[in-house]
């Protein structure tokens, strides 16, 4: 690999803005904000709008669109 062309890979904290859930992971994202976590270390902070803690698919609060109405309308329209 060429030296000096790759971004720095380091541990950062992603924080869900909705639920304020925080998790540490590796990333090359840059941030001016920092946060001190429970382990006593200071990490760059990256705020996200949606994470697995607030997304309806992962929380089980997802609403499924019912296709029954469309099927019933189709069958009624083309019923012989």
UniProtKB/Swiss-Prot annotation:
Q: What SUPFAM superfamilies does the record tag this protein with?
A: L28p-like
User: What are the recorded Gene Ontology BP terms?
Assistant: translation
* Record-level GO cellular component terms: ribonucleoprotein complex; ribosome
Keywords from the named record: Ribonucleoprotein, Ribosomal protein
User: Could you say which protein family the record assigns here?
Assistant: Belongs to the bacterial ribosomal protein bL31 family. Type B subfamily.
Question: What PANTHER family does the database record attribute to this sequence?
Answer: 50S RIBOSOMAL PROTEIN L31, CHLOROPLASTIC, LARGE RIBOSOMAL SUBUNIT PROTEIN BL31C
Q: What is this protein called?
A: Large ribosomal subunit protein bL31B
Taxonomic source organism: Exiguobacterium sp. (strain ATCC BAA-1283 / AT1b)
